[in-house]
Amino acid sequence: MVSAGMNRDLLLVIAVSLSLIVIFARNLGKHIEGISSDFDKVSSFNFELDTAKNPSRLKEMVTLQQGLKVLSDSLQAFSRFVPIAVVRGIVNNDIDLNQKLNEKRLTLFFCDISGFTAIAERISSEKLVLQMQDFFEIVCQAVEEEGGTVDKFIGDAVMAFWGVDGDLDHPVRAARAALKVQDRIQNQCPLWIELGGEAMQVRIGLHTADVLVGTIGSPTRLNYTAIGDGVNVAARLEALNKDLGTKICISDSLFQATGGTLQVRSLGYQTMRGRHEPLLLYELLGLISN
């Protein structure tokens, strides 16, 4: 016969075991919920992972958490080399890497530092690198704030574009980004001088046109970019600022697309290098408030 004492001990063991199972299940459930939540975050390009703050001791869960962190870190690093909108499009299957270029109406943006070669000769390499990092940060932040895509850096120049997402307001947003860049660069100049660098002036060209946009390259290396005559025009507008004494040169096609919301000064018809037909151009001065 089983004594009453043994029954009590058996019931106590069962109760403790059940309590431990419940605690373990709850703890496991919390970790699973955390990993599921973090997967949702990564899919929406939010890289602040909760599981990194609350690591599990269970081997299988640790493996899952480590794999999730590798995925998050990889996407975050990838997004620094490729426009975030492109990475998101690839991950969400909105961008087909095998698809040919598509024609779209975009607003093209080129920004370049005036007299960069001379500046590079006058200040140390260390100070130049720090100033260039500030410059690129200012330009990229302004472009991204206005919903644009930073395409590439070309030496000290930045190429960006708007309109891939179907936003019809892209000419105004590009103009607003250009004005932000000029304003912020001007505000940054005193700090550069204080740190032993030099003041910088930037030139910007804006043009709205139908161009080809998409992935192009070789089987081993692709680039998501815009190509076409409109891209060349935007680059020429940026360079034309030097001859015209302007800071932001825009085309008539962009001006007409903004519906009279821009404050401009007419530059008349100008002939650009490599083009036979002159274009009506304007200097962008500001935005007309409603």
Model-found features: residue ranges?
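Catalytic NTP-binding/metal-coordinating core of nucleotidyl cyclase/transferase enzymes
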Residues: 97-176, 224
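Cytosolic regulatory/linker segments at or just downstream of nucleotide-handling modules
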Residues: 211, 240-290
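Membrane-proximal coiled-coil signaling linkers
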Residues: 73-110
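Membrane-interface helix-start motif
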Residues: 1-10
